[in-house]
Regions:
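Short, well-structured alpha-helical interface segments that form or flank functional binding sites
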Residues: 151, 215, 328, 332
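Soluble catalytic domains of membrane acyltransferases
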Residues: 7-211, 220, 318, 334-454
């Protein structure tokens, strides 16, 4: 007989705060969020351990939490963020639980505190809630999957034992994928795989717990690796990542029937291309080594002349660069109108980013956090309140509706400006010889890849 469960719900103020974060994260920061496999997520009330790759710090669990709004999510986070008493209370209210690590926390009482966290996670699962963990036990700075720890399975089986092995606990593999880790107005993707039932393993677990967990761990890791972009050739990682992200990746996607501009389709194309490149590296090491060397030279050339790969596909002339300049001048009044109310969204993170953030994978998290707690309150909430008080509801509503449009306009204008700068560098007289050499090298790389991959 199944144990009757009653999943907790977030209080109203936390639901309101989640809606606000969703406005900032999904409405302003990301251009588009894609979700694939939502039908694989077990219904609320089912004990679920959701596991995923971890590549973008807070954004990984945040985006999942904002998609699974039908349930209370519980996350394990590094214990150092719980040191402040106010933060400790707030984070626990939102479903975060502290995970103490020997390498980062004081050794004493670590085991005892982790047992408390384990008990809280088991209680949440026993109540039919969802617990999300990252088995790599830390974020990666590359698009690859690290070694999985067994902690998530220990929690899952401990919860099953708490329920006397009478109720199923599900492991839900998931993956996070980003078109760009560091920039706003880019796309992100969440994929949910088929859930893995632990009930068929209960009897074996009671006889041989570690062997059973290792077997399941392999299944879970393979499921996540198949969903994500996994580049395991770390020796040539930078070159492979550049090739799939730029002109050759777009060419490959189009030739193989994928949509390069639609992230779920582009991920499939990137997976296919990366597998082909890594296979070619094993089968034709000398040819691929030359291609990777040329790719490194090409990347250095782009950096030297401050240009991007897309310019070689467009090949703009002086006239095209001039037209971009005239377009920027024509749109300048609109940009100024849009940047005045939204400027702090750009300025405040820039002020503190270099001083506070040492790990580049925290950049996106920092930008979202600053927007939620500082920039958006100053740029949006405060003006809306003042307009409502002094000018009336309709002025406040108009500003609220116009604000995201102004932010998107200012962001796209800045993108146009930097593309204009790149086009100018591309056609500058003193750069022409170097650009011609890079163009030849790019063609050589493309031809070399076509001959090896076909």
């Amino acid at each position: 007989m199944k144990r009757k469960v009653t999943p907790r719900e977030h209080p109203l103020y936390l639901k309101a705060f989640r809606a606000y974060i969703q406005y900032v994260n999904s409405g302003l920061y990301f251009r588009k969020e894609h979700v694939v496999g939502l039908e694989n997520v077990p219904v609320n009330g089912t004990p679920v351990v959701l596991v995923a790759n971890h590549q973008n710090c807070l954004n990984d669990p945040l985006c999942v939490c904002l998609q699974l709004t039908d349930r209370r999510m519980n996350f394990l986070a590094r214990a150092n963020v719980f040191k402040n008493p106010i933060a400790n209370k707030a984070l626990r209210a939102m479903g975060l639980l502290p995970a103490y690590r020997m390498g980062y926390e004081h050794f004493s009482e670590v085991s005892k505190k982790n047992q408390e966290t384990l008990g809280a996670a088991c209680e949440a699962l026993a109540d039919g809630e969802t617990v999300m963990l990252y088995p790599e036990a830390g974020h990666q700075d590359k698009r690859w999957l690290g070694v999985f720890k067994l902690g998530y399975l220990r929690i899952a089986f401990a919860a099953a034992e708490k329920m006397e092995f009478k109720q199923d606990v599900m492991i839900l593999p998931s993956c996070n994928h980003y078109s760009n880790y560091f920039h706003a107005r880019t796309d992100m993707l969440i994929k949910f795989g088929k859930p893995i039932s632990l009930m068929p393993y209960y009897e074996r677990y009671q006889q041989a717990p570690r062997e059973t967990m290792m077997e399941i761990n392999k299944l879970v890791r393979n499921a996540i690796q198949e969903m994500m972009l996994h580049i395991d050739d770390l020796v040539h990682y930078e070159q492979i990542d550049f090739l799939r992200e730029n002109g050759y990746g777009k060419k490959y996607a189009m030739e193989h029937g994928f949509n390069f501009n639609y992230l779920p389709s582009r991920l499939l194309s990137d997976q296919k291309l990366v597998d082909a490149l890594q296979t070619a590296t094993r089968e034709h090491p000398e040819k691929m080594e030359e291609i990777y060397k040329d790719t490194s030279t090409f990347m250095e050339g782009l950096k030297k002349y401050n240009i991007r790969d897309w310019l070689f596909a467009k090949s703009p002339g002086v006239e095209a660069a001039a037209l971009r300049g005239f377009a920027l001048l024509a749109l300048l009044p609109l940009y100024l109108l849009s940047i005045i109310p939204t400027g702090l969204l750009y300025l405040i993170p820039k002020i503190f980013l270099k001083k506070l953030i040492k790990d580049q994978m925290f950049v996106s998290t920092f930008n979202v956090a600053v927007s939620v707690f500082i920039s958006v309150p100053l740029c949006l909430i405060l003006p809306v309140v003042l307009l409502w008080v002094y000018l009336g509801f309709w002025w406040a509503l108009g500003y609220f509706i116009a604000f995201p449009l102004m932010f998107i306009l200012s962001w796209n204008y800045l993108r146009m400006f930097w593309k204009f700068v790149g086009a100018c560098n591309f056609v500058r007289r003193k750069n022409r010889k170097g650009v011609r050499e890079l163009k030849k090298l790019r063609k050589k790389i493309f031809n070399g890849l076509d001959s090896v991959l076909d």
